[in-house]
């Protein structure tokens, strides 16, 4: 007699089960610890009943990992990979395989967080230091930042920098008519809310009579023309204005640098240094400035300091410029940048070195010169005889026919009216050049035409100064050396591949391998953002699905995928609110209410759209003070534009009165911007659009699994209710029929499109039920950590039923009074236990905010809690007088191999006590490469790039 087959347990093998850390047995034990009978009961105790969604979240049925990859293959097949010679700041490039495998596909690099804890971030800080050095060398300027979001927003940031810093105090800014069109569009978006006038024209003819605070010139121009900008720069300086050059990095290896030409600021994209076009991104933009402007530079800057032993150590420098400290007075609202892409670009330069980069540039220029010679022979004279890689010709009535012939050979050309633009790159072959000639009606031989080609870089613009002279750009020529260098840097850092990263408000969850796989497929990575839409059909199917799913999750009616960071999403959402009020004849509504606990990007973003920030107080429980809100809403009723509020709150609690908050603001004519940074506590349980919010951004690099990349890339799409949908960001590449009244906030129409594949696969794999379960376990994990730590470090905020949301704030501040222990001491001591610190001093100074996410297992949560409890015992030893805080392992943390190998150990605690604290493994210990970094020294002695090799020679003498 046979035994019937048992029914299959799909949950045991589903992706959701692998994404979610705690097992069913773990969940039962954790519920017992937190004092709840079930997950459902815990949710009822955590979320206000007034906001719970009435029906379960319904998406498509969850797929297996194999099925999801098959689905992505089908989508990829709908995209057509042509050879795109469109230009406009996007180029084909070749990512060295050693970089693809060991950075882009390596979780040691892509799962790390922003390097606010420098001791455990030395690898990527060195890589970013290399990036800054590369940018300084190529631009000929003194200080560079560690990346911006894209070239268009970098130009806008440079415009704002010029307005702050120029001697001229006008409200007008000059833009060369030959900048990239998308850059001009982003500049228009940024300038209008601030009341700045853009003067767009020919700098030769139109700059003389213009009174401006700055000017932007493209170098080379978007047309390809290479023109000497020195006279234009001199005109700007004579007016007290700052001169900005948007410069092509590869071109700068063979043409004069912006610094040599007299520019004050240089901006651009590092995309063509090994980073695929990705249908628009992500790519690292750059900005470099002369020394006098360094303290106004937006974004992050890596500087060189020293550690506790006096050894060199990298850190983020001049952080007082940034939004998390300066708020509405910050130099920018930028938070997430493009660290992973900056690292790739820097390593591209390390891999090739200066000679390799010059060889690539000369090859590209040679092919362009040969192309131009052939076009002349065919009767199409280039518009300019001076160019680097792009040739522009007048095609007249033949334009459509030429484009059709090119497309029949799977080649895309750029078009501007009746003019055609052919932009070459390092992937361009002689066969491609011959195919372009055929599109223009000629059968020419590359070899025959090559002899007729002439150098198109004018002698006065040829680069004379050396670059990339530091040894790091010369020491890794072989793949063996390059591989080992990348491994050495990765080993210095602590990322999710080693341990839990319990950062509050950051949602450092699992980035599953399957989600990352399609990212490097050419069908997704090799598309130019301005190809004909028919060539990107797979992308647009994915976009439509994502927009639909995000609407179902959030309760909104429309979604824009364009914002390429959370801060950009905030900006786009506030622009939508501003546009809505203006369309109703209420453009005078400019007051934005922001709770005192808000993230620093909120007030910075409000300032950027021309709003005035009015701070609303919070009560002793961390909730918005309703009385204060009512008073300020009434006081500013006639001018009230919006409130920006985070939900659950930045204090880690679901506020009971969120509906009341929304109603109060709506009653006074305002709109509700609900910051989606904490959406990981809501998916499947509550929908912002249902309880009163009008607009939110979604941090796809938090809730929806795009990895943080060590500080970017990120994506911040926004969802809006129907009345705000007409005011979502537009783009000149997609707006021909119905232009949006709000311009673009990003250079590409769909932002960093290629990484949307990650969030898309995550949703495919999880389905509605899996996403809801992830939310529930994220909340359970946070309450479990709170329950375990509360007897040792009091949990500062809970709701009326004693629950936290998906994160909790613990309060060590009394310990500073009793024994001098600081939050910094605890954070650095956690490194000795193998952990990244929780979020420090936000939103409450001197506290720690912990967010475990749903991906961490009970075992890892216990390891973290055990470490925190052990640290509390060490603090007790200080309180009891065993040693002073200055002599304790807390103040000497983190401990390094230099400490354990110190022959002169003279501390009052044992070497093993410092280096191998209670509960840590001696076989698998993470050793940070430097001791505690001296922040004050680093800012007082600012070094932001590698010194040139000549400095080493002088030192040797």
UniProtKB/Swiss-Prot annotation:
Transcription regulation as UniProt keyword: no
Keywords: Oxidoreductase, Pyridoxal phosphate
Cofactor(s) for this UniProt protein: pyridoxal 5'-phosphate
UniProt record, GO biological process: glycine decarboxylation via glycine cleavage system
Pfam families: GcvP2_C, GDC-P
EC numbers: 1.4.4.2
Signal sequence residues: none
Modified residues (N6-(pyridoxal phosphate)lysine): 702
Catalytic activity: N(6)-[(R)-lipoyl]-L-lysyl-[glycine-cleavage complex H protein] + glycine + H(+) = N(6)-[(R)-S(8)-aminomethyldihydrolipoyl]-L-lysyl-[glycine-cleavage complex H protein] + CO2
GO CC terms in record: cytosol; glycine cleavage complex
GO MF terms held by the record: glycine binding; glycine dehydrogenase (decarboxylating) activity; pyridoxal phosphate binding
UniProt cross-references to InterPro entries, sorted A to Z: GcvP (IPR003437), GDC-P_C (IPR049316), GDC-P_N (IPR049315), GDC_P (IPR020581), PyrdxlP-dep_Trfase (IPR015424), PyrdxlP-dep_Trfase_major (IPR015421), PyrdxlP-dep_Trfase_small (IPR015422)
Family, per entry: Belongs to the GcvP family.
Role this protein plays: The glycine cleavage system catalyzes the degradation of glycine. The P protein binds the alpha-amino group of glycine through its pyridoxal phosphate cofactor; CO(2) is released and the remaining methylamine moiety is then transferred to the lipoamide cofactor of the H protein.
Subunit structure, interactors included: The glycine cleavage system is composed of four proteins: P, T, L and H.
Protein name: Glycine dehydrogenase (decarboxylating)
Classification of source organism: Bacteria, Pseudomonadati, Pseudomonadota, Alphaproteobacteria, Hyphomicrobiales
């Amino acid at each position: 007699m046979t035994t019937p087959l048992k029914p299959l347990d799909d949950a045991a093998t589903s992706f959701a089960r692998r994404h979610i850390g705690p097992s069913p047995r773990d969940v039962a034990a954790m519920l017992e610890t937190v004092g709840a009978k079930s997950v459902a009961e815990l949710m009822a105790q955590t979320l206000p009943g007034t906001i719970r969604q009435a029906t379960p979240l319904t998406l498509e049925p969850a797929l297996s990992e194999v099925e999801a990859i098959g689905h992505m293959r089908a989508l990829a097949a709908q995209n057509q990979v042509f050879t795109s010679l469109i230009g406009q700041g996007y180029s084909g490039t070749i990512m060295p395989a050693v970089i693809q495998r060991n950075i882009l596909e390596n979780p040691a690099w892509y799962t790390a967080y922003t390097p606010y804890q420098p001791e455990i971030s030395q690898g990527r800080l060195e890589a970013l230091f290399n990036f800054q050095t590369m940018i300084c060398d190529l631009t000929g300027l003194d200080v560079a930042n560690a990346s911006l979001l894209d070239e268009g927003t970098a130009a806008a940031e440079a415009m704002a920098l010029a307005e702050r810093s120029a001697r001229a105090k006008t409200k007008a800014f000059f833009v060369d008519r030959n900048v990239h069109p998308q850059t001009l569009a982003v500049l228009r978006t940024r300038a209008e809310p601030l009341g700045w006038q853009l003067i767009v024209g020919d700098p030769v003819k139109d700059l003389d009579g213009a009174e401006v605070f700055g000017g932007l010139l493209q170098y080379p121009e978007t047309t390809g023309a290479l023109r000497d900008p020195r006279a234009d720069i001199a005109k700007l300086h004579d007016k007290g204005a700052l001169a900005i050059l948007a410069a092509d990095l590869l071109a700068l290896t063979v043409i004069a640098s912006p610094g040599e030409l007299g520019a004050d600021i240089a901006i651009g994209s590092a995309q063509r240094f090994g980073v695929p076009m990705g249908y628009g991104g992500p790519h690292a933009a750059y900005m470099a400035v002369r020394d006098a402007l360094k303290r106004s530079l937006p974004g992050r800057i890596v500087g060189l300091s020293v550690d506790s032993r006096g050894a060199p150590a990298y850190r983020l420098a001049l952080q007082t410029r940034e939004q998390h400290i300066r708020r509405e007075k910050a130099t920018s609202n930028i938070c997430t940048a493009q660290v992973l892409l900056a690292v790739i670009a820097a390593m591209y330069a390390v891999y090739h070195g200066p000679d390799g980069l010059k060889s690539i540039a000369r090859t590209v220029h040679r092919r362009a010169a040969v192309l131009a010679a052939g076009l002349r022979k065919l009767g199409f004279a280039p518009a300019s005889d001076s160019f680097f890689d792009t040739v522009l010709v007048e095609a007249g009535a033949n334009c459509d026919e030429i484009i059709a012939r090119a497309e029949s050979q799977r080649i895309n050309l750029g078009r501007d009216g009746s003019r055609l633009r052919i932009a070459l790159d390092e992937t361009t072959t002689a066969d491609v050049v011959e195919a372009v000639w055929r599109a223009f009606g000629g059968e020419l031989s590359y070899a025959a035409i090559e002899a007729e080609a002439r150098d198109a870089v004018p002698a006065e613009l040829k680069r004379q100064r050396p670059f990339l002279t530091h040894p790091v750009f010369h020491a890794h020529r072989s793949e063996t050396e390059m591989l080992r260098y990348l491994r050495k840097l990765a080993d210095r850092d602590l990322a999710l591949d080693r341990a839990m990263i319990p950062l509050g408000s950051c949602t450092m969850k699992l980035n599953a391998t399957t989600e990352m796989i399609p990212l490097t497929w050419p069908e997704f990575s090799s598309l130019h953002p301005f190809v004909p839409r028919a060539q990107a059909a797979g992308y647009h199917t994915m976009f439509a699905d994502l927009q639909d799913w995000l609407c179902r999750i959030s309760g909104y009616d429309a979604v824009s995928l364009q914002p390429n960071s959370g801060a950009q999403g905030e900006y786009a959402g506030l622009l939508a609110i501003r546009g809505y009020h203006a369309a109703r004849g209420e453009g005078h509504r400019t007051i934005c209410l922001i709770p005192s606990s808000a993230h620093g990007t909120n007030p910075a973003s409000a300032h950027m759209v021309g709003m005035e920030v009015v701070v609303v107080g919070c009560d002793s429980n961390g909730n918005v003070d309703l009385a204060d809100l009512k008073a300020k809403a009434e006081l500013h009723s006639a001018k009230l534009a919006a409130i920006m509020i985070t939900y659950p709150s930045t204090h880690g609690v679901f506020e009971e009165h969120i509906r009341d908050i929304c109603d109060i603001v709506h009653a006074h004519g305002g709109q509700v911007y609900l910051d989606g940074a904490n959406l990981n506590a809501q998916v499947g349980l509550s929908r912002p659009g249902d309880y009163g919010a009008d607009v939110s951004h979604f941090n796809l690099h938090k809730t929806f699994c795009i990895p943080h990349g060590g500080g970017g890339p990120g994506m911040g799409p926004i969802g809006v209710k129907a009345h705000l949908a007409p005011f979502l960001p537009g783009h000149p590449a997609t707006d021909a029929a119905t232009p949006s009244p709000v311009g673009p906030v990003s250079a590409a129409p769909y932002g960093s499109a290629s990484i949307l594949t990650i969030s898309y696969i995550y949703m495919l794999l999880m389905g509605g039920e899996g996403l809801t379960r992830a939310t529930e376990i994220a909340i359970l994990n946070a309450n479990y950590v709170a329950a375990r730590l509360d007897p040792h470090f009091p949990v500062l905020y809970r709701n009326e039923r004693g629950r936290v949301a998906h994160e909790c704030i613990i309060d060590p501040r009394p310990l500073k009074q009793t024994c001098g222990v600081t939050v910094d001491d605890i954070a650095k001591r956690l490194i000795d236990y193998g952990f990244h610190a929780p979020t420090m001093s936000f939103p409450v100074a001197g506290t720690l905010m912990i967010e475990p996410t749903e991906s961490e297992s009970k075992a890892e949560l216990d390891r973290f809690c055990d470490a925190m409890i052990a640290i509390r015992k060490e603090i007790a030893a200080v309180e009891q007088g065993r040693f002073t805080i200055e002599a304790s392992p807390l103040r000497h943390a983190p401990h390094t191999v230099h400490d354990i190998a110190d022959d002169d150990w003279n501390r009052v605690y044992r070497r093993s006590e410092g280096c191998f604290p209670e509960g840590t493994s001696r076989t698998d210990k993470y050793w940070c490469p430097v001791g505690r970094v001296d922040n004050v020294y680093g800012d007082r002695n600012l070094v932001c790039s590698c010194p040139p090799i000549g400095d080493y020679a002088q030192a040797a003498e």
